[in-house]
Curated annotation (Swiss-Prot):
Key word Zinc present: no
Protein name: Peptide chain release factor 1
Gene behind this protein: prfA
Pfam families with a match to the protein in the record: PCRF (PF03462), RF-1 (PF00472)
Top-level taxon of the source organism: Bacteria
Subcellular location: Cytoplasm
Similarity-based family: Belongs to the prokaryotic/mitochondrial release factor family.
Post-translational changes noted in the entry: Methylated by PrmC. Methylation increases the termination efficiency of RF1.
Purpose: Peptide chain release factor 1 directs the termination of translation in response to the peptide chain termination codons UAG and UAA.
Annotated organism of origin: Prochlorococcus marinus (strain MIT 9313)
Length: 365
């Protein structure tokens, strides 16, 4: 991004920030909690950008003043040396600020701030794949706890020998999708199963899909396109089990997407959850179709959300996690206990690098 474009966009952001501050002082806005929350959230998003822009302007002013001092100090070796040293420090600070501001202005996914539904499906590997799906679920639950997110099961199909054939987690919090979107794809594990008597390493897989939450306005569903049936649930226990039909089986006929929800205590709650899951799945389908229409350059980026892409291998014998998109290894144990900050941070940095490259090519054209 050239300097003139950067400054223009920063000036626009600063003007927007000042407008939002004026709106927050408006009594009419204060009387509307929903509007107030929306404006406050947008102001909070812009504030770090505006503060960095003001810091850059201050550095620019100091640089000009120091440059003038250098011109006036010709012949005074000590003063010239001090001025040169100050200029180097200011240029280093300017470089850091410009890069940070450029990254902050890169195009962002409008869905980044949303909560998500995270679906884990056992893949190749039979019972071991189901156990692996359960291990992945615990990994994401622990990461959510570390971050301060709310993690709740929405739908689960348990396997006979432990683990899950399929599990959907609701993960709510700030900017959940911006981080977890990098987890979509095939996760492969290489380890000796507990049931393996010969000590042989087995390879199993599980597929993760990360679906940003969708509201009823964004994804509209025609009730006539739904086929809904109920069943007895083995859910909460007590007299409810096998006596009341609380489970909901929902089929979206145009797409063939099926959602079976049993986690809630009432049929109404399970139906609401099933509709939430269906909307998220339909939105994910729309996103996948949009990604398929984009250029190969865009698809080569890290956060494409393609659930068929093999993204990571977890090797127990070597205590190693390999992210194939990054070409990097990470220690296995911290990752499995939910310490995903370094790994996800590396994915974000790689995506930003791709975006900067693409921006550079566009400017050259």
């Amino acid at each position: 991004m050239d300097s003139s474009t950067l400054i223009t966009r920063l000036e626009t952001a600063k003007t927007s920030f000042q407008s939002l501050e004026r709106q927050l002082a408006d009594p009419d806005v204060a009387a509307d909690p929903k509007l107030l929350e929306s404006i406050a959230r947008e102001r909070a998003r812009l504030e770090p950008l505006v503060l960095d822009f003001e810091a850059l302007q201050h550095v620019e002013q100091e640089w000009q003043e120091t440059k003038q001092l250098l011109r006036e100090s010709r012949g005074d070796d000590a003063m010239e040396s001090l001025a040169q040293e100050e200029l180097q420090q200011l240029e280093a600070r300017k470089t850091v600020l410009v890069r940070r501001l450029t990254l902050a202005l890169l195009p962002s996914d409008p869905r980044d701030q949303r909560s998500v539904m995270l679906e884990i499906r056992a893949g190749a590997g039979g019972n071991e794949a189901c156990l692996w799906a359960g291990d992945l679920a615990r990994m994401y639950e622990r990461y959510g706890q570390r971050i301060g997110w709310s993690v709740q099961p929405l739908s689960a199909t348990e396997a006979d020998l432990g683990g899950f054939r399929e599990l959907i987690l609701s993960i709510k919090g700030d900017a959940v999708f911006s981080q977890l979107k990098f987890e979509a794809g095939v996760h492969r594990v290489q380890r000796v199963p507990a049931t393996e008597s010969q000590g042989r390493v087995h390879t199993s897989t599980a597929t993760v899909a990360v679906m940003p939450e969708a509201d009823a306005v964004e994804v509209q569903i025609d009730p006539s396109e739904l086929e809904i049936s109920t069943a007895r649930s083995g859910g909460a226990g007590g007299q409810n089990v096998n006596k009341v039909e609380t489970a909901v089986d929902l089929l979206h006929k145009p797409t063939g997407i099926r959602v079976f929800c049993t986690q809630q205590r009432s049929q109404l709650q399970n139906r609401e959850r099933a509709m939430e899951i269906l909307r998220a799945k339909l939105l994910e389908r729309q996103i996948a179709e949009a990604n398929a229409r984009e250029s190969s350059t865009r698809r080569a980026q890290v956060g494409t959300g393609d659930r068929s892409e093999k993204i990571r291998t977890y090797n127990y014998k070597d205590n190693r996690t390999t992210d194939h998109r990054l070409g990097r290894n990470f220690s296995l144990e911290p990752v499995l206990t939910g310490q995903l900050e370094e790994l996800i941070g590396a994915c974000i940095a790689e995506e930003q690098r791709h975006q900067l490259e693409e921006l550079s090519h566009q400017e050259e054209d």
